[in-house]
Amino acid sequence: MQNSLIIRNLGRQDYEPTLQAMHEFTDQRTPETTDEVWLVEHNPVFTQGQAGKTEHLLNTGDIPVIQSDRGGQVTFHGPGQLVAYVLIDLRRNKLGVRDLVTHIENTVINTLSQFGVESNARPDAPGVYVDNKKICSLGLRIRRGCSFHGLALNINMDLTPFLRINPCGYAGMEMTQLALLSGPSELNKVQPVLVEELTKLLAYQSIEWITESN
C-alpha cells in the first residue's frame, strides 16, 4: 500500500537465509505490495558485493565469506551491528537510485545527531563517517524498480574483523561505532530512532511494526 511501511524486526539471523528471503520478497512483490524495512543483527560474516575483489580479503580466518549481489565491495557483519534492509518500490515513491542513497545516508546522519554524534557522507565513498572513520556501510541492489539490501550501522560490536579486510575496498579504512562515541550500546535504543528518521525522509504516513521470533 502506498504511503505505508512495515518494519520487521528479525532479531539475530544468519546472512544467507536473510539474503534468500530478500530475493523472494522482491521477486514476488507486485505494484500493490507494501514497502518494508527489515531490521536484523547478523552472525559474523564477510560479504562480498558485486564489485568485490579477492585482494581486499586479507585474512578472513574462520569467518565465512559469502558472495552477495549488493553494490560495493567487502564488508563485515556481526553482533552489535544494526543492519536495515530497505525493500521499497522506487517508482511508486518517485525516487531515483541516487535519491535513495542520499535519503539513507541522511537517515543515518540524522539518527546519529539525535545521540549527539556529528557525521557526514562522502561523495567518493558511500556510507557515513565520523572524523573520517566509517560508522555505517551502504550497499543496494535494484530489481524491477524495487530496492533491496541496505545499510549496516556499527553500534557496539567487535570491530577487529574489519582489520582482516580492506573495508569497502579501501586499504586502511578505520572503523568506529556508536558506543565509542558516547552513544547507546543497545540496538533497541537506536532502531526506533533510525526508523523514525527514515519514515520522515520518505514521507510514509502509516507504520506497522512486526517482531519475528528467531
Swiss-Prot record:
All copies of the BPL/LPL catalytic domain together span 31-206
Tell me the organism: Photobacterium profundum (strain SS9)
Name the predominant localization.
cytoplasm
Give the protein name, as stated in the record.
Answer: Octanoyltransferase
Q: One GO molecular function term? A: lipoyl(octanoyl) transferase activity
Q: Which HAMAP family match?
A: LipB
* Cellular compartments annotated: Cytoplasm
GO cellular component terms listed in the entry, alphabetical order: cytoplasm
What lineage does UniProt assign to this protein's organism? Bacteria, Pseudomonadati, Pseudomonadota, Gammaproteobacteria, Vibrionales
- Main role? Catalyzes the transfer of endogenously produced octanoic acid from octanoyl-acyl-carrier-protein onto the lipoyl domains of lipoate-dependent enzymes. Lipoyl-ACP can also act as a substrate although octanoyl-ACP is likely to be the physiological substrate.
Which pathway features in its UniProt record?
A: Protein modification; protein lipoylation via endogenous pathway; protein N(6)-(lipoyl)lysine from octanoyl-[acyl-carrier-protein]: step 1/2
Q: What else is known?
A: In the reaction, the free carboxyl group of octanoic acid is attached via an amide linkage to the epsilon-amino group of a specific lysine residue of lipoyl domains of lipoate-dependent enzymes.
Catalytic activity, reaction form? octanoyl-[ACP] + L-lysyl-[protein] = N(6)-octanoyl-L-lysyl-[protein] + holo-[ACP] + H(+)
Residue numbers binding substrate: 70-77, 137-139, 150-152
For biological process, the GO terms are: protein modification process
Q: Which gene encodes it?
A: lipB
Query: According to its UniProt record, which residues of this chain constitute the active site?
Result: 168 (acyl-thioester intermediate)
UniProt EC number: 2.3.1.181
Do you know which PANTHER family this protein is assigned to? LIPOYLTRANSFERASE 2, MITOCHONDRIAL-RELATED, OCTANOYLTRANSFERASE
Alphabetized, the UniProt keywords read: Acyltransferase, Cytoplasm, Transferase
Q: Which family does it belong to?
A: Belongs to the LipB family.
InterPro entries the UniProt entry points to: aa-tRNA-synth_II/BPL/LPL (IPR045864), BPL_LPL_catalytic (IPR004143), Octanoyltransferase (IPR000544), Octanoyltransferase_CS (IPR020605)
> At which residues is there a site annotated Lowers pKa of active site Cys?
134
